[in-house]
C-alpha cells in the first residue's frame, strides 16, 4: 500500500483533482433537477472556487477558472462571459481575504462566503435582468445562495481532507 502512496500517477492525479472537479461540475451543470426537488439547489462551483482560491490557490489557476466560466455559460445558455466574470470576482474577493487574514478561521471564511455569494449573485442578476433583459427568478437565486451557504461546512471538510492529501503527496 505504501508503494501506491508514492506512485507518480497518484501525485499527478491528486495535484490536478481540483481542476478536474471544476471542469466536471461545469460540464454537468451540477444540480439536483433529476430528483424533482423544486426548491433545492446549490452552487458547487462557487464552493469549489472559494475554498481552493482561499486555502490553496496554487491548485486552481485563474485561467482554468476563466475557461470553466466560459464553458458554464455555454452549457446553461447565458451570454458568454457572465459566469467567468462572476468567478473571477469570487477569486478577487478570496485573494483579498487571503491577504488580510493573519490566521485562517472557518467561521470568518463561512461568513465571507455568504457575503461574497450575495455580491456575485446580485451582480449576475443585475447583468442578466437589466442589461440582457433575461427573465430571472429571484427566489431561485435566494434559495441557491442559502443552500450554498449551508453546505459549505460539509464541503469544507471534504476539500480540507483533499487539500491535506495533496499537500502530503506533493511534499513527500
Residue map of PLM features:
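Terminal, non-globular segments
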Residues: 1-172
Amino acid at each position: 500500500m505504501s508503494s501506491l502512496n508514492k506512485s507518480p500517477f497518484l501525485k499527478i492525479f491528486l495535484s490536478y483533482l481540483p481542476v478536474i472537479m471544476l471542469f466536471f461540475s461545469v460540464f454537468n451543470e451540477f444540480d439536483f433537477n433529476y430528483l424533482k426537488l423544486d426548491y433545492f439547489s446549490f452552487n458547487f462551483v462557487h464552493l469549489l472556487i472559494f475554498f481552493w482560491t482561499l486555502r490553496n490557490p496554487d491548485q486552481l489557476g485563474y485561467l482554468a477558472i476563466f475557461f470553466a466560466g466560459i464553458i458554464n455559460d455555454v452549457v446553461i445558455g447565458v451570454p458568454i462571459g457572465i459566469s467567468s466574470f462572476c468567478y473571477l470576482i469570487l477569486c478577487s474577493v478570496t485573494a483579498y481575504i487571503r491577504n488580510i487574514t493573519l490566521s485562517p478561521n472557518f467561521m470568518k471564511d463561512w461568513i465571507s462566503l455568504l457575503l461574497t455569494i450575495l455580491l456575485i449573485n446580485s451582480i449576475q442578476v443585475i447583468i442578466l435582468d437589466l442589461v440582457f433583459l433575461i427573465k430571472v427568478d429571484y427566489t431561485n437565486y435566494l434559495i441557491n445562495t442559502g443552500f450554498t451557504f449551508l453546505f459549505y461546512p460539509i464541503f469544507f471538510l471534504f476539500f480540507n481532507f483533499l487539500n491535506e492529501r495533496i499537500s502530503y503527496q506533493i511534499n513527500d
